[in-house]
């Protein structure tokens, strides 16, 4: 057995020696590596020049083009189009309208971040803010105060207006399921025509019925949003039923003493709504999460829950003793920014 193994080893050694001799006398041996042009931009997916070592360059084969090399493709800009004179000035809350079909106009408010430079803009996230039932967009903008935070500096904030000041899925809604999702898509496409927005960083935040609308986007349009935050949310069953496949980062904030939309779920306006923990568990399953992590205490007092191994993060903040409000401690707007600005598709 050992003699056979030794003979095989000697045969392999002879073969390797032949290969080494052949490579030493190869006509390509010793060819200098051509240096890259100074200041040449790195291509997407390429290695840095100093990582290439002595790898020889590969030249294009001449197929009749007199030795011309094909130009390298330029990096792809996810949103190369923008208007250097856009309709809405940065730092101002303005009114806009979009046609959602058949000449039907719907209204929204928009605040373009103060750091947005129309002539040389960077890719900018977009945040949709949805108020509760009967809230005007002006009212939600007033109490959420997004413009006074990093949202107002670094994002485009859009406050859509609900028909009859309500959002799809609720028993009092004037729209059918899908109508308000279509409205949001239409606004986004219209804004994208003039601004350099990052489609991988589109978010939604909402209060009460608006929190349900944010969850509806995560459920029914996971391709559209990278993250959502719902505060004191009304999760009527159509909002979170028959979800499309796709993981969306989700933060739910709800008070244990909510007297309007009970924390544990219930009935309202003749229709059932789901409890906060039930909805969070469903999102965790949809996002492929593992077990819940031990909660940690934060200012409030509140318990902050998370999950392990999610395709997109799922978090829940259970605010002890809080009623049906846009919470100030911990501050919902600050929590929303801290959670959302890390999310990206």
Where are the language model's segments positioned?
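A domain-start/cap signature at the N-terminus of enzymes
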Residues: 2-9, 19-126, 205-229, 235, ...
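The conserved beta1-alpha1 loop
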Residues: 125-132, 232, 254-255, 320
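Alpha-helical scaffolding within the catalytic cores
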Residues: 140-147, 234-242, 298-305
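Acidic beta-to-alpha connecting loop that harbors the catalytic carboxylate
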Residues: 162, 256-259, 264-267, 320-323
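Active-site nucleophile loop of the alpha/beta-hydrolase fold
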Residues: 162, 229-237, 255-258
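Conserved alpha/beta-hydrolase "acid-adjacent" motif
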Residues: 259-264, 271-275, 327-329
């Amino acid at each position: 057995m050992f003699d056979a193994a030794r003979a095989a080893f000697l045969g392999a050694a002879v073969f390797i020696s032949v290969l080494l001799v052949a490579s030493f006398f190869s006509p390509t041996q010793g060819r200098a590596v051509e240096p890259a042009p100074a200041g040449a931009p790195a291509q997407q997916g390429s290695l840095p020049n100093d990582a290439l070592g002595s790898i020889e360059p590969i030249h294009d084969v001449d197929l009749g083009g007199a030795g011309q090399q094909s130009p390298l493709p330029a990096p792809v800009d996810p949103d190369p189009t923008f208007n250097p004179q856009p309709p809405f000035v940065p730092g101002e809350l303005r009114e806009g309208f979009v046609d959602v079909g058949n000449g039907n106009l719907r209204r929204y408010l928009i605040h373009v971040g103060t750091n947005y430079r129309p002539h040389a803009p960077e890719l900018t996230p977009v945040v949709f803010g949805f108020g509760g039932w009967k809230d005007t967009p002006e009212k939600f903008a007033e109490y959420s105060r997004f413009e006074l935070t990093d949202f107002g500096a670094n994002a485009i904030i859009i406050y859509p207006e609900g028909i009859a000041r309500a959002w799809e899925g609720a028993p009092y809604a004037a729209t059918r399921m899908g109508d308000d999702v279509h409205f949001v898509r239409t606004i986004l496409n219209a804004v994208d025509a003039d601004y350099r927005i990052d489609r991988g960083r589109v978010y939604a935040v909402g209060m009460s019925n608006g929190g349900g609308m944010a969850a509806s986007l995560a459920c029914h349009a996971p391709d559209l949003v990278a993250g959502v935050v719902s505060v004191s949310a009304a999760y009527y069953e159509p909002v979170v039923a028959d979800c499309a496949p796709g993981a969306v980062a989700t933060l739910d904030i709800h008070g244990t003493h909510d007297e309007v939309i009970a924390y544990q779920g219930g009935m309202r306006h003749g229709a059932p709504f789901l409890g906060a923990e039930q909805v969070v568990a469903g999102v965790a399953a949809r996002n492929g999460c593992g077990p819940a992590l031990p909660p940690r205490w934060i200012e409030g007092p509140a318990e902050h829950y998370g999950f392990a191994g999610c395709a997109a993060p799922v978090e829940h903040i259970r605010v002890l003793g809080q009623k049906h409000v846009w919470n100030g401690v911990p501050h919902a707007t600050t929590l929303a920014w801290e959670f959302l600005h890390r999310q990206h598709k």
